[in-house]
C-alpha cells in the first residue's frame, strides 16, 4: 500500500485497506491509499496494463521458469487480453520452443502482431507490435553460459522461488 499523491492523508492504511484488497470493493484511484501489485495474480510479465493502454510497441522479456516450453505466461496473457479487452495477439512460438532432443531453441525472440479492436471515440482499430523474448539457449552462447549450464542443467529455467542468486548465476542470466 502507498499513499495516493493526489490525496493528502495523515492516517495509516489500516484494516479497511485489507478488506478492500480481499473483496475488491472500493479499489480505485480515488482512495487515499493505493494498492500496488506486480500483477502476478493475472499474468507475470506486466503486459496486461500495457495492452489496456493500447501501446503500439511492447518489449516483453518472459523470465518465467518454463522447462517444458508450455508458454503458460504468454498464453495466459493471450487469453486475458482477448476476454477483457478484445485484443487479439498472434504468437507463433515454434521457433522459440525447445527441441526435445537438443534442448535448444532456434531463436530467443519472436515479433508478433497485436490487434486492438475499435474501442469507441479516440480509440480506433489499430495494430501494434510486441517483441517477445524468451529465456532460451540456441547453441551459440558464450563459454560462461555453457559452463553454467553444465553445472546447472535447469538453466535458464531454474525455479523462480530462488531469490538468492550467486554471482555466477546472476552473471549467466545477465548475459543470456
Predicted regions and their residues:
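Catalytic domains of lipid- and phosphate-ester/thioester hydrolases
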Residues: 1-176
Amino acid at each position: 500500500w502507498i499513499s495516493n499523491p493526489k490525496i493528502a492523508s495523515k492516517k495509516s492504511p489500516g484494516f479497511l485497506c485489507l478488506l478492500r484488497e480481499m473483496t475488491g470493493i472500493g479499489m480505485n484511484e480515488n482512495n487515499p491509499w493505493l494498492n500496488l501489485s506486480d500483477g502476478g495474480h493475472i499474468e507475470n510479465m506486466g503486459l496486461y496494463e500495457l495492452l489496456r493502454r493500447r501501446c503500439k510497441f511492447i518489449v516483453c522479456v518472459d523470465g518465467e521458469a518454463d522447462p517444458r516450453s508450455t508458454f503458460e505466461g504468454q498464453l495466459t496473457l493471450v487469453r486475458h487480453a482477448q476476454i477483457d479487452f478484445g485484443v487479439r495477439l498472434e504468437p507463433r512460438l515454434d521457433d522459440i520452443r525447445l527441441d526435445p532432443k537438443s534442448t535448444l531453441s532456434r531463436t530467443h525472440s519472436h515479433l508478433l502482431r497485436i490487434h486492438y479492436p475499435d474501442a469507441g471515440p479516440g480509440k480506433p482499430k489499430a495494430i501494434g507490435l510486441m517483441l517477445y523474448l524468451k529465456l532460451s539457449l540456441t547453441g551459440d552462447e558464450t563459454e560462461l553460459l555453457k559452463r553454467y549450464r553444465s553445472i546447472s542443467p535447469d538453466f535458464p529455467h531454474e525455479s523462480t522461488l530462488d531469490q538468492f542468486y550467486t554471482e555466477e548465476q546472476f552473471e549467466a542470466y545477465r548475459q543470456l
